[in-house]
Swiss-Prot record:
Quaternary context: Homodimer.
UniProt keyword S-adenosyl-L-methionine, yes or no: yes
Class of the enzyme per the UniProt entry, highest EC level: transferase
GO terms of molecular function: carboxyl- or carbamoyltransferase activity; S-adenosyl-L-methionine binding
Gene coding for it: cmoA
Protein name stated in the entry: Carboxy-S-adenosyl-L-methionine synthase
Amino acid sequence: MSHDPDRLFAQPLARVQDFVFNEDVARVFPDMIKRSVPGYPTIVENIGVIAAQFAQPNTRLYDLGCSLGAVTQALRRHVSQDNCQVIAVDNSTAMVERCREYLHAQDSMYQELLPVEVLEADILALEFQSSSLVALNFTLQFIAPEQRPALLGRIRQALVPGGALILSEKLRFEDDEEQQLLTDLHIAFKRANGYSELEIAQKRSAIENVMKPDSLETHRQRLLEAGFSKVVPWFQCLNFASLIALP
């Protein structure tokens, strides 16, 4: 499927609205995420590789906050356990509709892929079934901080022994100099990918009230308190990282 280039913030806006995952964003999302998140393609593909090491027969693999289904597609490319099913969940109607279109296109190109169910739902209200792999790929940061512990606890309870949670997030840093350096480098990354100063500033204004990053130590402590036994960072590029949490 084709997608449009991200020009959502290219023109001056009289009032910058809070960022929402609507049809406008869904239409440009592949371009937006690739140009905004350093290492994103590597993270997505390796979630599939990692999942293949943890997926178990007769369980479900969850992609929570699936957006257009990039992680779901990676899971289906790499996992071949018997009687596994991918459950892809997002609360955005626009994202879910396009996700289904992308997965239909994937089905037409490959044979014997894992079955997938795409749900338009709030992951905070989702009833988890027995799972061997859960992916939260840049999703937790959009959930209210006070609601994050309960969600992680419910995910931990749903994971079978030998399963795993993969958590990818933008990070904040306790050290002010480290925070400033990595913020500046991230802005440089976006400039190098063709975003103007206006686009960078307006996108930052739109997203700062809806995305609340945590530090790596906050993530680690929260996961341990939720019942996970081990937290292993496996990827970091600038201020973006991905962790494996083991039950």
